[in-house]
C-alpha cells in the first residue's frame, strides 16, 4: 500500500503495519478505542499492558498530554531537545479521553517522537498519535525485515507500508 492508502485505512479505524526507526510496527489511531481493541486481539497482547505511542513532533505530543506541572514541563523540554526525535519513550500523563489500551492505571502513556520519515509522515496524515507496538504476535520475535513479517498477522490488517527507508533493526525503543 502507498502512504495515503495506509493513512486512510487508519483514519477509517484500521490496523496497519508500518516501519519505524528500529522495527516494523503494528499500529492504529491511538484515539480509536475499537481499533486499539482489535489490534490487541490480533497481537494476542493482554489488555492490561498499554500500547506505546509515537507522534510526529512536539505539537503532536502536546495534543496527547494532560496538564503538566511546571517542573515536568521544563524536564520534558530538556529531554526533547536532547533525545528527540529518537527511540527514547517516556511515560507521561495523557488525556483521560484516550483509550485505556494506551494508558496505564495511573493515566500514563509511553510516548516518543519518531525520527523515521515514513512513520512521521503517517502521524501527520492521520492527524495524531499512532500505536507503535512491534509487528509480531506476542511472544514471537519482532523484525526489521519486511520478508519476515508474519503472513497471518499481515492478513489480519488492512495493509502494510513496505517502503524505504526500512527499519534499521536493533533494540526497540528505550523506556
Task: Indicate residue ranges for each PLM-predicted region.
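Active-site-adjacent structural elements in enzyme catalytic cores
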Residues: 1-175
